[in-house]
Amino acid sequence: MKKLILILAVAFTTIFAVQAAKPVKIIFDTDMGNDVDDVVALDMLYKYIDEGTIDLLGILSSKRELGSIKFIDAMNTIYGYPNIPIGIVKTYPSENYVCTDKRLNYADYTVAQHNYPHTIKDWDAVEDGYKLLRKLLSKQEDGSVTLVMVGFSTNLVRMLDSKADEYSELDGKSLLAKKLDKVVIMAGNFHEKKKEYNVYKDHYAAVRFYAECPVSMLFTDYALGKSTLYPYQTVYEGFKYCENHPLPLSFHYYAQMPYNRPLWDPTAVLFAAEGHKGYASLSKKGYVTVDQKSITDFTVDKHSNRQYYEVNDAQRAAIVRRVVELTMRGPKNPYNKK
């Protein structure tokens, strides 16, 4: 009898271990080309795929610049994941979007200066971001997808307004409610009364999506990312497996090296892939609002499903260690081995 109990215990333990190891399904929405932390975040996603932690269903650019998706496609190809689908914003629904700082266009510079391998042959055929989101979600189990947003809410406000189509009979909001588990988002500033980039670059979209998103939203804000820095030594040392690797070149084109860069977007990827245990704690539940100056505010309310991450010094150190460890690791199946 004791032997049977032991066998059953081992069997159940094995089943639970397999269930616990089930990859997190992630869709990544990024403003690739504005700040280089997006590149670090994307590198982390590939490494998580390598180790079986996540299943990256697709990547959406919240911009309409071709340089953004060309950069993403080159990264997909170099890291050995050429078939990850990519979406782009075809037209902007908001007239308030302005991005004229030429220094920020490292994605354009990087792909223009180097002959990277590409998988996509027809850039005009790349699907509109919200349409790709509908397509991807329609194929997933209910409540199974984590949306990681590290750019503007442009794709998502268009998703909210979308109607039934060839992919789903549901409207956009209903499809999000049915298929998403949660949204992990880098946006806002809950510690200072200052506007934050991902909010004010498409103010209209941020106001609407933060209010209307039908699932829980977990915010990693400006202050958290600013307090965790990606060391420049890693940029120099970690990417020698590929000639002219896009990540160190992005840092070079973005600003004069050497410099450490805040881990704004990588924290969202980390929390989505691994959870926040050991890395952060969560605030009380509440509402996130955006005023006319794009300043975010958090109001505690136990009936809401918005929260933000908080970190102490030990957790900051743990975040940096983990991001460095992941990005220093070479990919499993790189396109171009040096």
In which residue ranges do the predicted regions lie?
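N-terminal acidic, glycine/proline-rich low-complexity segments
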Residues: 21-338
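Bacterial Sec-dependent N-terminal signal peptides
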Residues: 1-23
